[in-house]
C-alpha cells in the first residue's frame, strides 16, 4: 500500500499529494487484532490523515477499543481528527501552532496565547500538548501544568518536507 506525493521546490513549496491507499476491511480487522495485544504503558501513535476508504472516526474507534488498557496514545492529526479523540484522554497530542489556532478559532501570536490554547485541549482531555512552531521551536504543556519551551538550531532551510 503506497501513494505518491510530489514536492516542488521553486521559490515556494508546492505539495501534490496522491490519494491514500484503499484499506480493505480485512486489513482493519487485522490491525484491531494487533492493537488488542497492546498492554499498559505500550505506546500507540496515530498520525496524519485517514485514508478515504476508512471512516473519518477511525482514530476514535481505535482509541475507544483501547480504553481502560493503559495504552499511551500519541495523536498528531489536524482539526476534527484531533479534537474528536480528546474524550479518550490521549497521553500526548501534537498540533502545530497554526492547527492549534484553527482548533480554538483564533490566530496565536504569542507564547502566552499558545499556552492558553494548549490548556484548552487539556481541559477537553489531552494529558500533554506539544505544539511545534516551525523555526520558533516547540512548546510543551505537560500534565502537571508545567510549560517547557525549546528553540531550534538556526540555519538555512534547504527543504522543509518531513520537518513537521
Q: Predicted segments — roles?
A:
Residues 1-42:
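Conserved N-terminal subdomain of the carbohydrate kinase-like
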Residues 64-65, 111-163:
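Conserved phosphate-binding/catalytic region of the ribokinase-like
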Amino acid at each position: 500500500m503506497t501513494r505518491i506525493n510530489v514536492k516542488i521546490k521553486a521559490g515556494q513549496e508546492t505539495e501534490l499529494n496522491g490519494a491514500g491507499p484503499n484499506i480493505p476491511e480485512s486489513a482493519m480487522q487485522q490491525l484491531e487484532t494487533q492493537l488488542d495485544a497492546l498492554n499498559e504503558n505500550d505506546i500507540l501513535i496515530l498520525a496524519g490523515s485517514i485514508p478515504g476508504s476508512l471512516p473519518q472516526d477511525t482514530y476514535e474507534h481505535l482509541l475507544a477499543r483501547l480504553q481502560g488498557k493503559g495504552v499511551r496514545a500519541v495523536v498528531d492529526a489536524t482539526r476534527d481528527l484531533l479534537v474528536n479523540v480528546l474524550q479518550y484522554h490521549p497521553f500526548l497530542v501534537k498540533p502545530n501552532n497554526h492547527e492549534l489556532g484553527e482548533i480554538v478559532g483564533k490566530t496565536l501570536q504569542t507564547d502566552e496565547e499558545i499556552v492558553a490554547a494548549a490548556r484548552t485541549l487539556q481541559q477537553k482531555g489531552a494529558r500533554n500538548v506539544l505544539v511545534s512552531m516551525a523555526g520558533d521551536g516547540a512548546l510543551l504543556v505537560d500534565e502537571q501544568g508545567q510549560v517547557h519551551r525549546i528553540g531550534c538550531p538556526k540555519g538555512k532551510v534547504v527543504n522543509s518536507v518531513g520537518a513537521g
